[in-house]
């Protein structure tokens, strides 16, 4: 259904069929560190970067406690930071000073699926995102060298890809900010169950 939603839309179909290369690897340097990025699709002559994304709901917003504002799925999942980094590396590759166009083609997991094509170009926001990267570059370098473990945010693509379940957790842990004084009781019940199951 999701693929059909893409192919039935004239604009998205045009972007998909546009001459360009898929899964393009580019390398560059940012803040004194080597970076390697993978572009879902790159149309070099038009300097167009296309990223494919799925989301539960394209219009749903999330509250960000740091800013006190509600954010789109693209902001909440760090796609603007990704766009800022990819754009800088692409500029080095293309030997240009202006930004390439960065488009996210997104489809929702709803039935029927929603779809959208979003331009992420926003130089002020890119500058902010890059300043955040620079602020944490020492930590990023330590993670890359294997000297420290990355901090899990639970939102980005890396987190679910590397997530390992170590125990069954109470249902209420899915509710942000919700806690239950009986959590230790749940842990005891689960431990007793596992002990019995392994006997």
Indicate residue ranges for each PLM-predicted region:
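Low-complexity, compositionally biased segments
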Residues: 4, 12, 43, 54, ...
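Residues in well-ordered beta-strands of folded domains
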Residues: 23-25, 42, 105-106, 160
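Non-catalytic protein-protein interaction segments used by genome-maintenance enzymes to assemble
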Residues: 26-80
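Secondary-structure boundary elements
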Residues: 11-18, 43-51, 90-100
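Metal-dependent nuclease catalytic cores that hydrolyze phosphodiester bonds in DNA/RNA
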Residues: 1-39, 151, 157, 173-177
